[in-house]
């Protein structure tokens, strides 16, 4: 599957780090706002303050974690593109598995295997959905079969009028 709007590999890492950080801050901000609101003392003022405080403290941390994941994933993906010489879904699946394993390395080999499997499965699902969507949308833009005219509506070839029309040859 070709990706048309992707940057070349050195800049792709920076681009993916920034995108992942942004996703983490926004998603984490929404989640932390709800969590801070629910865990604050009773009263709308306390709840809004608790919500804002939770977002201020936790959203940048979550964004940083997402940025680390995105940067490591893109680095491994670019390395695989360079190593294999082609860009295909297997690079992303392998990158997801290796990223999961590397990030879980401090937790031991069992956690590494579990995280590698989860990363690979997650990326396989994402790539599979992307391929299915590409195939589905490609079918929508196929050329339509040529429109064939109804032969009963075409004028006759031998000069006689079509049925229901008078013959004007008698007036010549």
Curated annotation (Swiss-Prot):
It is found in: Mitochondrion inner membrane. The chain crosses the membrane at residues 17-37, 61-77, 113-133. Signal peptide: none annotated. GO terms for cellular component: mitochondrial inner membrane; mitochondrion; TIM23 mitochondrial import inner membrane translocase complex. Disulfide bonds join 9-78. Pfam families: Tim17. Keywords: Disulfide bond, Membrane, Mitochondrion, Mitochondrion inner membrane, Protein transport, Translocation, Transmembrane, Transmembrane helix, Transport. Its main location: mitochondrion. Expression is abundant in heart and skeletal muscle, intermediate in brain, and weak in pancreas, placenta, kidney and liver. GO terms for molecular function: protein transmembrane transporter activity. One of its GO terms (biological process) is protein import into mitochondrial matrix. Residues 146-172 are annotated as: Disordered. Forms one disulfide bond. It is a multi-pass membrane protein. It comes from the Eukaryota. Component of the TIM23 complex at least composed of TIMM23, TIMM17 (TIMM17A or TIMM17B) and TIMM50. The complex interacts with the TIMM44 component of the PAM complex and with DNAJC15. Essential component of the TIM23 complex, a complex that mediates the translocation of transit peptide-containing proteins across the mitochondrial inner membrane. Belongs to the Tim17/Tim22/Tim23 family. This is Mitochondrial import inner membrane translocase subunit Tim17-B. It comes from Homo sapiens (Human).
